[in-house]
Amino acid sequence: MKIALVHDYIKEYGGAERVLEALHELYPQADVYTSLYLPSYLGPHRARFKSWKIKTSFLQYIPGKAKLISPLRLLSPLAFKSFDFSGYDLIISSATGAYFPNSVRKNSAQLICYCHTPPRYLYGYATARQWKHNVLLRIIGETMNHILRIVDLNASKNVDFYIANSLEVKARIKKFYRRDAVVVYPPVELDLQKETKGQERAYFLTGGRLARAKHVDVIVQACSELGVPLKVFGKAFAGYGEELRKMANRKWLMVDGVKKSTIEFLGEVDDKEKLELMRGAKAFLFASEDEDFGITPVEAMGQGTPVIAYRSGGVKETIEEGKSGLFFDQLNKESLIEQLKVFDKKKLKEEECIARAKKFSKERFFKEVASVISKKTA
């Protein structure tokens, strides 16, 4: 069976790209199609895709394309329609909700969509909102979004079967597309896990994609006010990193005789560094709004690190309250501070966190995806 994998674009390495990587591991002979491939923006993750056979669209040849990701979504349906899938038996789209990969001309192939979420910006979910402050941009943006909702709905009809990455996303698919879906949770790397008993856990940790919808500012403000040490890792977008640094406090701690800020920004890190950070953290803090699934909190649990998360979206499915983590109910620093103050008293256990994370292993993902696809292509 000849298989093609289709992904919106490859410019950053997040949860969706981890799923694409796992699909490619499951189907190593599959060709990969994407509208744009920008390896220079992938940082320490660039090598992951180096040996892949990646086919790009005409968008790859547009000057300044890296800074035009948002406006280029208007051309993305044409980009995916431009690919020739004749001769393929199966197309698996990894649809992040950024572009419209389900617009492909599938010919005689079957199209199965692994849906990370319907486009958040089209259906009222948390995303970048700065453009709405400008009246003219808001009028233009809302008009284009109306057109793109029609495009998205038409593309959804092209899909033969949906796989959702969480119950949260399954409900969105039903609500906006009137389609059923089976849930297969994304794969989480657990094989690098090490024994952490006796290791000092001296700080709180947050990180991942530092976008505004992740609300890292709430975490920075809460930890600043309490004066507790916080490490922040990840790539920042659209000037958000500078905003976070400006709001970070000017309180200092003495560490080995050296005066250091309580808030430390580490930038982008590779997987080994990330897991080491997680193993040394008291808890991983997560304030994302309407999160589709949330791989990073599960990775933290896999290192025996509990999670304190905003009660929203997919993390409600992954965190066992009182066992592998805690929730705060209001998206503000005061609500998070309440949980930070009682965290030590809860005495959450490493083994509970690890046991929970194992339910989201890569091996489980391989087995479930292969089973679904086998049944649907039989």
Predicted regions and their residues:
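Active-site donor-binding segments of glycosyltransferases and PAPS-dependent sulfotransferases
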Residues: Q29-F100
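A charged, aromatic-enriched C-terminal amphipathic alpha-helix characteristic of glycosyltransferases
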Residues: R73, L78, K345-K375
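Membrane-proximal helix-turn-helix segments that form the acceptor-binding/catalytic region
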Residues: W131-Y162, K170-A171
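Conserved donor-binding/catalytic core segment of Leloir-type glycosyltransferases
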Residues: V188, T196-K214, V220-K231
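Nucleotide-activated donor-binding/catalytic signature segment of Leloir-type glycosyltransferases, i.e.
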Residues: G234, E242-L275
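Aromatic "clamp/platform" in nucleotide-sugar-dependent glycosyltransferases that forms part
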Residues: E289
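Short hydrophobic beta-strand element within catalytic cores of glycosyltransferases
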Residues: P306-A309
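Conserved acidic donor-binding segment of nucleotide-sugar-dependent glycosyltransferases
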Residues: E321-G322, L326-N332, L340-K347
